[in-house]
Amino acid sequence: MKTPTAAEIRELFQRYFEEHGHRRVASSSLVPQNDPTLLFTNAGMVQFKDVFTGRERRDYSRATTAQKCVRAGGKHNDLENVGFTARHHTFFEMMGNFSFGDYFKADAIAWAWELVTSPAWLGIAKDRLAATVFAGEGTLPWDEEAFELWKAQGVPVERIHKLGAKDNFWAMGDTGPCGPCSELHYFQGNDVPCAEEQAGRKCQGVACDCDRWLEIWNLVFMQFERGQDGGLTPLPKPSIDTGAGLERLAAVAQGKRSNYDTDLFRSIIHAVEGLSDKRYDAASDDGVSMRVIADHARATTFLVGDGVLPSNEGRGYVLRRIMRRAIRHGKRLGLERPFLAAVCGAVIDEMGAAYPETRENRAFIEKVAQQEEESFRRTLDKGLAILEGEMRKLVPDATHDGKPATPAPDRARPIIDGKVAFQLYDTFGFPLDLTRVIAAERGFDVDEQGFDRHMAEQRARSEWKGSGEQGVDDLHKQIAGELGEVKFLGYELPAARAQVKAILANGARVARAGKGDKVEIVTDATPFYGESGGQVGDVGHITGAGLEIRVDDAQRPVPGLVTHVGEVLRGEVAVGDAVELSVDDRRRDLVRANHSATHLLQLALREVLGEHVKQAGSVVAPDYLRFDFSHFQPVTEEELAAVERRVNELVRENAETETAVLKLEEARHAGAMMIFGEKYGDVVRVVRIGPSKELCGGTHVRRSGDIAFFKIGSEESIASGVRRLVAYTGARAVEVQQREAEELRRAAALLKAGALEVSQKIEQTQRRVKDLERALEEARSKAAAAQSGDLAALAKDVGGAKVLAARVEGDGKALRELADKLRDRLGKGVVALGAEQDGKAILLVAVTRDLTARLKAGDLVKEAAKLVGGSGGGKPDMAQAGGSDPAGLEKALEKVAELAARALA
């Protein structure tokens, strides 16, 4: 049988289950939707979580996927092991088949066995396979059914192993669906090292942590519901959730002991070889670094492709840790120039056919990688210098590279101060684990509790409130599961009749509500648009017999559910009532115009700035629109003008807005724009306005001319590689334009110029200011030269050198210039100058270079600064300090003279 490629295995797996009645479902984003409990998608079942719990309904009961997954950060974290083992990854693909109350154990086991062993499919040798089943634990019964089913497939009894709940019982949480699981393991051979045997104990076989028996597929049988009391109730419709890692299956099918030796990684590692001019040797330190880079480039490519950007919090921080770990391993390979973008390119070459979105976003992914690496490299050497300086303080006999001499066996490892580790994180972007690894390599530990304390203090100072990822109300999920999707009528109607299906008040479901109650009303249908996709929710009224509810907002807390948030102004509302729902159509018109303008804006930005521009967030409100987009430098005034001009051209074309409901793949092939990391269903709505074509569920104008006028208000950076633009439409845009014109008229009047001459007049004024500054500088320099001659005469001879301490007039710059001139005049000596400016003390100390081995300016100024209530530092030959108490200047200067005299005597 021909050895299959990983791409063939991925296709073969999904095709097998398609032939057995499963719907092939595309991988969801690595950023989980509506699941704040997860940092990243880490299993195939994540996108089906609400389907398994009954809170979401789909038009199929069997599914198969190849799901993008990341395990790095949080509970599921493989980061530290990556590169050092044959099978750990931050990014991996989890293939799976799922049954939502359809088939159960018999089919799941039979299909798994056939797919793995049949020569028509994977053709893996049966005599190298073993199965595990749940052995039972406490009140949980053993899974005799699974045991008999494996036996019926021909698996010998001695190769069906019973394991406890730790290995073979799965639960979604403390409560909810759970059940036994069953694993398929592949025997790699007794020559695979086992730590148990090396310690003189027996290898535990399938239960051992060694790689002799490699788990390749896990079948979860969801057959119980665990209640609050811990009791188990059989589910009326048991379900199946399975997961088979593509990387492991590829290694087994290709006869490789390491995932990194498969074709999934071969081309990526080959790219690293080419960049480093080194050959891959799996057993060497360089081999570890190449594996780290290959794995982390995959994670970087797919995380950035799903809209995650490097930052100092949340998901962005995990990505930054991954990227910077890869960059550091690149430096260990001798890669002194940025390389990560090129390796990400190799990942896209390898995986772009399976994940076309990586090809579409290639330029953006590579740019983010390049920018992050350049940023980190700028600070890496500075941070390492600080870390090595700290190591030398702790171990004075350290070598030149900061590596301490071998400590005595009973000597405790020296500890890097948590404050230093935090400074490296806060100032130089060193993730804590990077500091930990560098320290460990050189025989040091890190005070992680101290680091955490400083981190907590910083968050308190900046009133840090967390990532904002708050839990989704279980009541909303419960209602959505009971009622199904609320029908949206707002594309055609501003008002409609509907029936009240649920009422929430004070965080609880109630049967009725009366005047003054703050409520959330759920109806079976609604013309109200629930906030989503950046578009704010509608406002309006709900009325009925003697009833009036003011709707202040419409929300979409979970997919398919719209809640009307407001206050009962009159009468009473009860579940089952027939009501009239009316949207504030005038406000909706303003929102429509801003939403359609947002689509045209994205098109114009891509035309003017380039295809790398992607939406990174938006707000569509009645009075403005805000658009966040990927771009790596400030947008110039000329570019902004071109964007604004292009949008207004499209407005004047008065193109009709067209909508179509298409299958996701049809929309993709039609060239519709999609949003980074957005979760789309199998069927999507495409909105076309002239040349603009986007996937969108929002409300829009009938023709582009209804926007009337478009005006950009501001543009700024909000994160690395992300810009924010605020704009206006219609009457609000005219108002902004008029306000700007009025400001221009005022500026012209102040400058005594015409409106079209303002910039010219400002340039003239700037040139005049520069000329005056230059003249002032020359006068100051002459004054300093004259003053230096007078002051030099006051210097005292100490041990063959001159010491001068004097109070003068001037700012910090003037003191530096004067100190330079005095130092030159003295030839060999120490200069200390002090001045008062704006009620503060300024101190400056300069030491001639031939004396810096005996005394340092930084040490002198630190001591003196204490006497003026301040602090300072600098280089050995010049240092500066500031303080809040200028009354102490005389004593501070005397202190410098005293310390200098003592050192020189």
Swiss-Prot record:
Function text: Catalyzes the attachment of alanine to tRNA(Ala) in a two-step reaction: alanine is first activated by ATP to form Ala-AMP and then transferred to the acceptor end of tRNA(Ala). Also edits incorrectly charged Ser-tRNA(Ala) and Gly-tRNA(Ala) via its editing domain.
This protein's domain notes: Consists of three domains; the N-terminal catalytic domain, the editing domain and the C-terminal C-Ala domain. The editing domain removes incorrectly charged amino acids, while the C-Ala domain, along with tRNA(Ala), serves as a bridge to cooperatively bring together the editing and aminoacylation centers thus stimulating deacylation of misacylated tRNAs.
This protein's name: Alanine--tRNA ligase
Gene Ontology CC: one annotated term: cytosol
Binding positions (Zn(2+)): 595, 599, 696, 700
Catalytic activity, reaction form: tRNA(Ala) + L-alanine + ATP = L-alanyl-tRNA(Ala) + AMP + diphosphate
TM spans (from-to): none
Taxonomic lineage of the native organism: Bacteria, Pseudomonadati, Myxococcota, Myxococcia, Myxococcales
GO MF term (any one): zinc ion binding
Keywords, comma-separated and alphabetical: Aminoacyl-tRNA synthetase, ATP-binding, Cytoplasm, Ligase, Metal-binding, Nucleotide-binding, Protein biosynthesis, RNA-binding, tRNA-binding, Zinc
A biological process from GO: alanyl-tRNA aminoacylation
Cofactor needs: Zn(2+)
